[in-house]
């Protein structure tokens, strides 16, 4: 199945977070946090402006980003893999 995001929506795949502490202890449960980094796998056509024009998104497929995981971030399973659907406004930075 293929997802094609609309407007200013971005689809990304969460990057795995290190599950060991600096001292080598395996983190589980509440100590193991979910990563807020992800790789962009699809982008919408752009943000629709009030005058009817479309502003292109700043992120592109392949970018690794840091995002704000909060209200408005939708998690979906597609072909057995978790993907996140969010607005470009929820992206805080591009990792270069």
Swiss-Prot record:
GO terms for cellular component: cytoplasm. PROSITE patterns: CHAPERONINS_CPN10. Its main location: cytoplasm. GO terms for molecular function: ATP binding; metal ion binding; protein folding chaperone; protein-folding chaperone binding; unfolded protein binding. It is found in: Cytoplasm. GO terms for biological process: chaperone cofactor-dependent protein refolding. Gene3D superfamilies: GroES chaperonin (2.30.33.40). Keywords: Chaperone, Cytoplasm. Belongs to the GroES chaperonin family. Together with the chaperonin GroEL, plays an essential role in assisting protein folding. The GroEL-GroES system forms a nano-cage that allows encapsulation of the non-native substrate proteins and provides a physical environment optimized to promote and accelerate protein folding. GroES binds to the apical surface of the GroEL ring, thereby capping the opening of the GroEL channel. Heptamer of 7 subunits arranged in a ring. Interacts with the chaperonin GroEL. This is Co-chaperonin GroES. The gene is groES.
